[in-house]
Amino acid sequence: MTVSLRRRPPPRLVAVTAALFAGRGAFRAALWTANLVLLGLWGAEEFALYATANGVSGWLLALTSSGIEKAALALVPRRGGQTLRPLFMLLAATPFAVAVPVWLALAAADPGGAPARYAAAAAYACGLGCCAVMAALNRLRGRARADVFAYLTLAVAQASGVGLVALTGMRANALLALHVGVLAVLNAVLAAGLIRGRAGRADKGSYRPAVRAAALLSVGEVTAVAATSVTFAYFAHLDDAQQTSVFYVWSVALSVVVMGVSYLLRILQPRVAVWIEGTGEAGARRMARRILAPAVPAGALAVVVLGVVLAGGQRGMAATGAALLAEAALTAAVLPAFLLVENTDDRGRRLAAVAACLQFAVVAAAGWFLVPAAAAFGALLAYCAGEVVKGGVMLATLKKETS
């Protein structure tokens, strides 16, 4: 049966989506609030140890969750795809299962040392990645409540951790250990809910394409994290704490939009995958082209206008806010188009990966000049330029394919 994407969403889908956003929103709010409170409780020195360990390990979250989750959401809903569920569970659990013993060994040797702290942060990132995939697989089985439960549990863990720090004076290593322990139990519970149902026996020949899909689909998230890391490195080179702090605030605001759109697309992705299976890949590519056709020229115009503003010496809050709005609008347009192409075949996924790599190259190159020149405004302008190139490469290729 062909699934139409133009139908009005059923009330149950709207209610489930609202509940899922509430769970994720509670976790994000708890995480950001906890960091602010921890800074006050610990002071800058101890908090820097905690924040740096988490920051360095952030790429592991993207590596262990995004590609695997997106591949599962693209392949499992299709005919015969349920047999791939154990493979995606294994791909999600393996990094966490490796990271935890390494952390335990280092913690046993030196509980308060830097190696144990970084290993705990790495295990925490892998655990969060595993949780995201397990929650997605539960959603695919119609168990959306498991996703909500998981992220509400993580929100409670953040609040409880802050409470323990206030009551006991526990330090960064101990708090990271607490979060790793919570994730170990939570992931086991999520996995148990998946193991109870029979997935059937998969054709081993389908494993390699599934792993390849997961690898290709991880590129966009990993390059996005890398672009953010490189941009912050440019700010570190400026050695201006105020400018770095201002950019951090703007980047948090942007991340709210990006994560919100990304998560909404993850919720809708199984329906998109089934729709593409029913209507054909050509229809998905045509729809992606129709989305990008106005978005890319509008984005290019925005970059030119913002460049003129920069050349005129304007780089204050109004200019930075305009750049933020332009980047948010571009992202909101480009992500759905890429979702359509990524859910077609390996050729589409390779194209999306190449476009993401080019986006990273543009952000890194433009940021090298723009961050010293205009700080937060320059960084957001570099982001806009990267988004235009990413969408432009995709649009140019789709025009060749669909003309």
Mark where each language-model region is.
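Membrane-water interface segments that mark the loop-to-transmembrane alpha-helix transition
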Residues: 15-28, 53-108, 112, 277-303, ...
